[in-house]
């Protein structure tokens, strides 16, 4: 399934998902530091493995995917399958609505100045 077939995302629900499943390892605010995972500010349109100051796996650097709705939708289903060798231990979100909600939240949260 593709992002275009996903239900419309709810950023409020996506924020809850981020706080419970992602915030332990990621930040979204501009200028916030890296944690176990990289800061996600400016994520949309950025190439994987290119955030300054974060040490990525070779798999992430070599994948060279441009992050957007479609690529995140596929990645968040099964990160280790999408980018073999990724350091991200998160198993993924199987429910299409959860992925759509999270992407909707990330679009807002990672673009705020």
UniProtKB/Swiss-Prot annotation:
Modified-residue entries (N6,N6,N6-trimethyllysine), positions: 80, 94
Residues noted as binding heme c in the record, renumbered to the chain: 22, 25-26, 88
Main location: mitochondrion
GO molecular-function terms, A-Z: electron transfer activity; heme binding; metal ion binding
Record keywords, A-Z: Acetylation, Electron transport, Heme, Iron, Metal-binding, Methylation, Mitochondrion, Respiratory chain, Transport
PTM annotation, UniProt: Binds 1 heme c group covalently per subunit.
The organism's place on the tree of life at top rank: Eukaryota
Location(s), subcellular: Mitochondrion intermembrane space
Function: Electron carrier protein. The oxidized form of the cytochrome c heme group can accept an electron from the heme group of the cytochrome c1 subunit of cytochrome reductase. Cytochrome c then transfers this electron to the cytochrome oxidase complex, the final protein carrier in the mitochondrial electron-transport chain.
Designated name of the protein: Cytochrome c
